[in-house]
Amino acid sequence: MHLHEYQAKDLLSSYDIAIPPYRIVSSVEEGELVLRELGINAGVVKVQVHAGGRGKNGGVIIAKSSSEILAAIGKLLKMRFESNQTSGESLPVEKVLITPLVNIASEYYLAVIMDRKNRCPAIMLSKAGGMDIEEVAQKYPDQLLTVPLTPSARIYNYQLRQIIKFMNWEGDTGKQGVQLIKKLVQCFYDNDASLLEINPLVLTQEEELLVLDAKVTIDDNALYRHPKLEVLYDPSQENVRDVLAKKIGLSYIALDGDIGCLVNGAGLAMSTLDILKIHGGSAANFLDVGGSATEQQIQEAVSLVLSDENVEVLFINIFGGIMDCSAVASGLVAVMQTRENLIPTVVRLEGTNVELGKEIVQRSGIPCQFTDSLNEGARLAVALSKQV
C-alpha cells in the first residue's frame, strides 16, 4: 500500500525525523489560512498522488509570493496528474502540500529498500539527490552505495561509519546522519515497509539535514498488524479494477495487454503470462482466483476481467486440485449469458470434475475453444487476439 507524501511525512515525524513545516489543503480558502498559520510568503506546492515524476510533469510549483502560492493551489487542484508511472491513466488531485522554501547546500538520496537480488532489506544512498535513482545507477554508479541490513532490524557501527565516509558527512552533519539512518531503519521494520525513500534529503546552508520529500510503501500482507496505517488507503489513486478485486478478495493486477487471464494459483498465473509473451501476446492482467473459489467468486472474477475495455480475448487456465472445474464452468456461463457482445474465449480445464465442467460450457452454447495443453491454449489465445 502506497502512502501519500504527507502521510509518509506524518509517519517519519513520529520518529522525530527533521522535516520542514508542511500543511495539506484541498481548497484555495484553506490555503489562505495555512499561509497565515505558517507565516510564509514563498514556498513549494505539490500534488498529492501515488506516482513519481511530479516535478517533471507539472505537479510541483515553486511559488515566490503569497499570491503565487494561492494561484498554484488553484491550478494543481484542477488538474489530473499523469506521468510515465501512471500507466497511461490520470490520477485525481484532491489535496496539495504546502511547505516553505529552504536554503539548500547539498542534495542526497537515501532509502531503505527490499533488495531482491540479495534477498534482504538494505540501505541505498547516493550523493546525487533529486534525480531518479535509476538514472543515478546508470550514469553515476560510483555515487551509489548499498548496505545490507540484518533481519534483526540492526545496523552496525561499522556500516554507519561506511555510510558517513561515503556521503562525506563530517562533524555535526555526520552525527545527524547517524541518528537519521537509525530512525529510518527502525521505522522501516516497525511498520513492515517494503520501501522508505527520501529524495531529496538535503543539507541546508544552516548545516541541518532535512527530509524534503518522502515515499513509503507498506506490505499489504502486513496491514492487519497496522490498523492506523490501513485506514490511510486511498482507493482514488488505484486502478478501479484493482480496488474492486480487493473488495471481493481476489489477487488482481492490471497490465497493458489485450488477453484477459483467469487462473488459479500464483505460480500458474505467472507461467501463463510468460507463455503468452513467448507466443507473441500480452496479458491484460494477472488474476489468481485461489484454490477454493466459489461459483459466485468465479462470476465476479470473469466480470472483473471483462470490465477492461482492452481485453479482446479471454483465456481461462484452471488446474483443479482443490478447485472444482464445474464451479468454474458454471461461473463462466452465468456471466457470458448476460453479455451481448461475446469475445473469443479459450478454456483449459484440468482436474476435479473436468468433464462435467466442459459439459456445462458446451450445453450453454457460448462460443469457446477447449484445449488440454497450456502451450496450445496460449498459442490459440494469442492467435485469436491478433485476428480481432
From Swiss-Prot:
Residues binding ATP, per UniProt: K46, G53, R54, G55, V102, E107
UniProt catalytic activity: succinate + ATP + CoA = succinyl-CoA + ADP + phosphate; GTP + succinate + CoA = succinyl-CoA + GDP + phosphate
Gene Ontology terms: cellular component: cytosol; succinate-CoA ligase complex
Enzyme class, broadest EC rank: ligase
Cross-referenced SUPFAM superfamilies: Glutathione synthetase ATP-binding domain-like, Succinyl-CoA synthetase domains
GO molecular function, one term: succinate-CoA ligase (GDP-forming) activity
Binding site for Mg(2+): N199, D213
Residue numbers binding substrate: N264, G321, I322, M323
EC numbers for this chain: 6.2.1.5
GO BP term, example: succinyl-CoA metabolic process
Record's function text: Succinyl-CoA synthetase functions in the citric acid cycle (TCA), coupling the hydrolysis of succinyl-CoA to the synthesis of either ATP or GTP and thus represents the only step of substrate-level phosphorylation in the TCA. The beta subunit provides nucleotide specificity of the enzyme and binds the substrate succinate, while the binding sites for coenzyme A and phosphate are found in the alpha subunit.
Assembly behavior: Heterotetramer of two alpha and two beta subunits.
Stated name of the protein: Succinate--CoA ligase [ADP-forming] subunit beta
Source species: Chlamydia felis (strain Fe/C-56)
Gene name of this polypeptide: sucC
